[in-house]
Amino acid sequence: MKDIFEKYIQSIASKFSHEETSEMGYRTDFEILLKGIFESVKGVRILHDAKSVQGNKPDFVVLSGDVPILYIEAKDIGVSLDKIEKSEQMARYYGYTNLVLTDYLEFRFYRNGIKYEEPIKIANCNIKNRTVECAVDNYDHLIKTLIDFARSQKEPIKSGKHLAKIMGGKARRIRDNIKQFLSIESEKNTELFRVYETIKKLLVHDLTLETFADMYAQTLVYGLFVARYYDETPKDFSRQEALERIPASNPFLGHFFYHIAGRDFDRRLAYIVDELCEVFSHADVQELMGQYFKKDLWGETHEGPDPVIHFYEDFLNEYDPFLRKKMGAYYTPLPVVKFIVRSVDYLLEKEFKLPFGLADASKTTDGIHKVQILDPATGTGTFLTEILDHIYARFTAQGGRWPAYVHSELLPRLHGFELMMAPYTIAHLKLTIKLAKTGFTIFNRGKRLGVYLTNSLEDIGRQPELLAFDFAASIAEEAKEASKIKNEKPIMVVVGNPPYSISSSNKGDWILNLIKDYKKGLNERKINLDDDYIKFIRFAEHFIEKNKSGIVAMITNNSFIDGITHRQMRKHLLETFDEIYILDLHGNSKKKEKCPDGSKDENVFNIMQGVSISIFVRKEGNKKGLGKVFHSEIYGKREIKFETLDKSDLKTIKWKKLDYSEPYYFFVPKDFSQKEEYDKGFKVSELFIKYSVGIKTKVDNVSINFDRNVLSERIQNIIESKYSLQQMIAKFDLAKNTTWEYEKVLTIKDFDDKKITPYDYRPFDTRFIYYDNNFLSRSRSDVMGEFFQKDNIGLETSRNGDYTFISNTISDEHFASDNSFKFPLYTYEYDGVKQKPNLNGEIFRRFLEIEPKIEAIDVLDYIYAFLYSFKYKEKYKEFLKIDFPRVPYPDDGKEFNRLANLGAELRKLHLMESDKFNKLVTTYPESGNNEVEKVRYKDNKVFINEKQYFGRVPEIAWNFYIGGYQPAQKWLKDRKSRKLTNNEIEHYQKIIIALAETDRIMKEIDK
């Protein structure tokens, strides 16, 4: 064996001595070495360059017969394996059971994504001298370790996180392999393509190959997990056994798992699935879940959540965190679900005179059940499961009737729609098991569970009969049955937690036509009504409009209850419903929400967006006028909110009837008693003639940088290299689904250094941007052209008055809020030299009447001071949330000059032009590398790493907000892993002065 290693090292060293040798140049030598090592193991063969054969695989596969037992990924000699370990490629490969990472000299071992054994080096290299030095003592150690490692795979999984990591890795492999398979034409792909085309035609019209690969992989992997979770024979597990665990409640699921367990299942995927089954056979899934979820997410005194559901979210985090966020896959806490279910039950009894509430089995004159229930975004079936529990509680003394009741009175009217195949799978299994525990186990073709795989927001229409009885036909049947629910059932109750996806992909004609009712008469340039949750509310409202009575009860994003662009939506809901109940659960960390007493307010979900429970009631009979709105709210920590919800329903909550008014129809209490006085002032958008929102890049990683030279080199490289969009996405870490119009960049012939200019990215954070419309989504040149390479100054504020700042260069649309507007003080003539005030002449003349000897800058300073007044912001807070701020005219010249002088101080501070910066008040006492590692604040010190800190930093400066940002914190956090220059260290200390002085001047303004 020693001879084999010596020949290998000798050949490797010879090739390494030549700089032009690439990673591929060592492959043949390495394959010979592997064959020598495994020569003594019967039936083993080495597959070289597995990527080219099957795609998305490590470079070498060691097989025993046809079964892979070891995967090896090889990198070039001298490459940092530490960095490779953290790469996206390795994240995918960690789904392999036995994996080795090597640079041909060092070997690292991973079992199911976890490091295994210590690395072994058979040689060391000197990159500078291009030499290789043997480590002879490790030859035998590598042989033994590789053979033992390949043979032994049956180790128990000891933690839920480890299992989630393995499942995520396997799912990524399946997803990536399917994408690879379907990217080329092959007879082997016929069945996969058939399934894809059927789903696209009947379920998801805009389905891409990438999304299909994701759906397929998730359903397969997580479906196996759920089957294993309910496996009563824990010592073994296989695809065939998983098939036996699938209930007869849904032919679609049965066909899917029959497809997986069958002999014709794609062999290129089968070995991955079998690997996962092998892992499951050595994992006590129920025990792991029991350990993993001993503490639930909302306090130990409550009933814990379903571990299967919470594990699914952890699986998504490992599999694709971006997908979890995008799809809004958040488990609805049980107290929320129970509150909604109890409230609906109460309303059915009280308002609709149905004595059995949700359990009521009465029928219409057409013989159809009256209380038809739908969860249009059912997810994993949490709401339907709770409804089932709630109804079953009424049968405690009538257990003998239960099976017959379920068969004839419950299943025909309990419906759920779900687009994602994995949650859909979980919902079916979970509901089936829940029913089994109550004593109902008999399903047949006529009485299946009414949970369907469909896109609620798509109108697929009635489907023709299909005579085939295979997997594809079962998908068609699923679509047909879902279409019947949408078009024929008189849905009376709609419940749920619809997804929150601002960048919605649901853009079908049917739902967009319905949403038009929410946009009538709106004149905003940007109407933010495309979030999925709004579409689901409109979808639910549509059913009640058709039925002419019913209830919608959902927990959603709460932006619609007081958003300005949501005013027509609120009016339309008032036209449809008789009573609307809004239980605001707050929890909006974006708005820095706190309890009325100043204590912490938390969200019931792990998200930043606030939420509310909304219950819309349309009573039977003719609708007259607009409906009534009742409001209540719960502040506090999550546990407090859950405790309140747990013991309440609509009947016990204390509601306040709102006196809403046009044109806004707010669903929250508002105090507009100061309206007459407020309206006497002028709106900033009336004072400034020209203004716009800031620049939209869509690709900050490309167009913006801290360093002018770095940005210059990057832009030149992009222009010269003409990368493909996919190369740009990989190279600059762009969103995979970016809508950036990169093709415009490809038209640029020459780099223009003059287009690199300072850019106000965030408050006190000026960077550099390549200001070229081809690189930007929206350049806003009409307004930003007044700043580009020109001397100007501009007010920065927003429509909801949450911040005010000043800027003297072009700026970002997210400068200090979601939509930051810029108001230039001056505009330039066509010659680009002569400037004139960008002010409304009539308003400016009013100021001249009060104080004759003033200029445009003085008016700006006066406004600036007023917008920093605590008293002003508190007094007019409700008005400031609606539109651009209005500023009162001064009573006299004395008041004007006092405020203008204070505003001038603020302006100079915020532009870093104040004399206050001549003397620093903070310290920076410790020397070091100046790298920002971990930012923390303690005892008036702002640490940037373990050793170095800024001293004497006042707490008021550290916590000071400008819009949605805390500049003293964000400026440093945005520079994590960067080494601060001397100028940056000084600049940060000036930020602290500016913030502390701003607080002082704000108090002066209100004196």
Where are these regions (language model features)?
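Sequence-level detector for compositionally biased, low-complexity segments
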Residues: 505-514, 523-524, 542-1007
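Charged, often low-complexity linker/regulatory segments
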Residues: 1-40, 44-52, 223, 238-240, ...
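Short, basic/polar, glycine-containing "phosphate-handling" surface segments that engage DNA
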Residues: 2-16, 64-65, 75-215, 219, ...
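Conserved catalytic cores of phosphodiester-cleaving nucleases, focusing on short active-site segments
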Residues: 30, 60-62, 68-76
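Preference for the N-terminal adenyl/adenosyl cofactor-binding alpha/beta module
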Residues: 153-386, 417-422, 454-460, 490-503
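Short acidic loop-to-beta-strand element that houses the catalytic metal-binding Asp/Glu
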Residues: 54-64, 612
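SAM-dependent methyltransferase catalytic region
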Residues: 47-52, 293-299, 303, 307, ...
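Metal-dependent nuclease catalytic cores in nucleic-acid-processing enzymes
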Residues: 31-36, 85-105, 430-437, 530-543
